[in-house]
Amino acid sequence: MASFVIEGGHRLSGEIHPQGAKNEVLQIICATLLTAEEVTVNNIPDILDVNNLIQLMREMGVTVAKEGIDTYSFKAENVDLAYLESDKFLKKCSSLRGSVMLIGPMVARFGKALISKPGGDKIGRRRLDTHFVGIQNLGADFRYDESRGIYEITADRLQGSYMLLDEASVTGTANILMAAVLAKGTTTIYNAACEPYLQQLCRMLNRMGAKISGIASNLLTIEGVEELHGTQHTVLPDMIEVGSFIGMAAMTKSEITIKNVSYENLGIIPESFRRLGIKLEQRGDDIYVPAQETYEIESFIDGSIMTIADAPWPGLTPDLLSVMLVVATQAKGSVLIHQKMFESRLFFVDKLIDMGAQIILCDPHRAVVIGHNHGFKLRGARLTSPDIRAGIALLIAAMSAEGTSTISNIEQIDRGYQNIEGRLNAIGARITRI
């Protein structure tokens, strides 16, 4: 098991480019199964979760070719349906959460999908009900094989339907959407997720011949078509990585420029960091973060403590709350971090407390952070990364700490961040992989 050794206290300086968005590319790769024609995807990040899904596609019989440093082509002309029933395939699915989004394309195009309970982060309960109920509403049958621990989903031809989702699930909406584009008739999805990832998926599917309207809203209408064709698609920059770099700059008192961020797709992320007192400027499609010796958390107009909470888009993505919590440990003032959507993502705060942070964990969803105003540095420590987002938050803490820190289980970080130590070392960090 690999680890990072981080020498804290070094300022960063220079330019850094965000990778392609992990949450988008997992959906896009699954969507290539909807056509027998070639689909070319640009700006694919070289990270563990994505590479595992690409390898899974190869094993399914999809022709995958690496066309450039971050460009792949996919041609699902001869999918091996027998392999999809093998224990090897099902075992791989169980270790990759993104595999759940294979259900919609497989059922829509081939009439059948088998999948085991998918893996991924251990950040609390992530229900699959939205996926299953939505695809059932399109006419699919679900059967759970208790002896093998797998779900079998079958359908002769999916039928369009109206559905009101009980939660604005990003992956659930994507799965239903990918199934509905080849269904007979019209499908209406109300309370659909509308994150930029979903907007990108919708636009790609429309270029492939789908008929989707209501893009960027929570009401999607899909008129089913007989078949889709090939296309080209470019993945957006990863907004989570952009936010992570803003947090790193603040914690290490650094001046950096984050290049080509697709600013219009960042939503309220920049404003959320400004509420913590962090200065940043939009320069074209870049974000410039000046060096700040201190930053002060804002208060609400009535003087009450600032609250930073996640919410479905256009609210703040839950994937950045771990970073914002760490950033607040060195701010002037206090903030309540409210993680509404998952109940275990704050369970890494004990590690920050061991490093000297002042944090009160109120319950599994809420933590109050009392900032040090950079008056007391965090201390280097031996740490373990429990999930992707906590892992990057701990890395930020270690980079700002006094002394040396070690982070183990960095495979979790590798799942979501491409060559993170190489890119950060290039702008002044001191991180060694051992």
UniProtKB/Swiss-Prot annotation:
Residue sites binding UDP-N-acetyl-alpha-D-glucosamine per the record: 97, 319, 341
An example Gene Ontology molecular-function term: UDP-N-acetylglucosamine 1-carboxyvinyltransferase activity
Catalytic activity, as annotated: phosphoenolpyruvate + UDP-N-acetyl-alpha-D-glucosamine = UDP-N-acetyl-3-O-(1-carboxyvinyl)-alpha-D-glucosamine + phosphate
UniProt EC number: 2.5.1.7
Pathway note: Cell wall biogenesis; peptidoglycan biosynthesis
GO CC annotations on file: cytoplasm
Keyword vocabulary terms for this entry: Cell cycle, Cell division, Cell shape, Cell wall biogenesis/degradation, Cytoplasm, Peptidoglycan synthesis, Transferase
Record-linked Pfam families: EPSP_synthase
GO biological process, one term: peptidoglycan biosynthetic process
Enzyme class: transferase
Binding locations of phosphoenolpyruvate: 22-23
Family: Belongs to the EPSP synthase family. MurA subfamily.
HAMAP family from the UniProt entry: MurA
Purpose of the protein: Cell wall formation. Adds enolpyruvyl to UDP-N-acetylglucosamine.
Record's protein name: UDP-N-acetylglucosamine 1-carboxyvinyltransferase
Source organism (scientific name): Bacteroides thetaiotaomicron (strain ATCC 29148 / DSM 2079 / JCM 5827 / CCUG 10774 / NCTC 10582 / VPI-5482 / E50)
Gene: murA
